[in-house]
Regions:
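Generic hydrophobic, amphipathic alpha-helix propensity
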Residues: 18, 43-46, 50
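Canonical Rossmann dinucleotide-binding motif of NAD(H)/NADP(H)-dependent dehydrogenases/reductases
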Residues: 2-34
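The beta1-alpha1 cofactor-binding region of Rossmann-like NAD(H)/NADP(H)-dependent oxidoreductases
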Residues: 40-44, 59-72
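A glycine-rich helix->loop->beta "capping" turn
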Residues: 5, 51-53, 73-79
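Ser/Thr-centric signal marking residues that sit
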Residues: 8, 12, 62, 74
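Conserved glycine-rich Rossmann-like NAD(P)H-binding loop of the short-chain dehydrogenase/reductase
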Residues: 29-46
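Conserved residues in the N-terminal Rossmann fold of short-chain dehydrogenase/reductase
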Residues: 35, 57-58
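Intrinsic-disorder-linked linear interaction elements in eukaryotic regulatory proteins
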Residues: 25, 54-56
């Protein structure tokens, strides 16, 4: 069994770089992952490449409203 099966992670800055690396690793270990990034197009590309265990979430970490919306979308998608 995968170590993260049944778990969900919201990873910020996950459209590229280290965030993307962690998102890939979490999916590989069985987690559902929200690819959260201000670059929604990049997040969508990353989510598409990772498959059905990943969704793209537009999220600006400097905005509480954006954070709340991103969390809500993640819960809705994987609950």
């Amino acid at each position: 069994m995968s170590r993260l099966a049944g778990k969900t992670a919201l990873i910020t800055g996950a459209a590229r770089g280290i965030g993307r690396h962690f998102a890939t690793a979490y999916v590989r270990e069985g987690a559902n992952v929200a690819i959260a990034d201000i670059d929604v197009e990049g997040a969508a590309r990353a989510a598409e490449e990772l498959g059905s265990a990943a969704i793209a979430v537009e999220l600006d970490v400097t905005s509480k409203a954006s954070i709340d919306k991103g969390i809500d979308k993640t819960i809705e998608a994987f609950d």
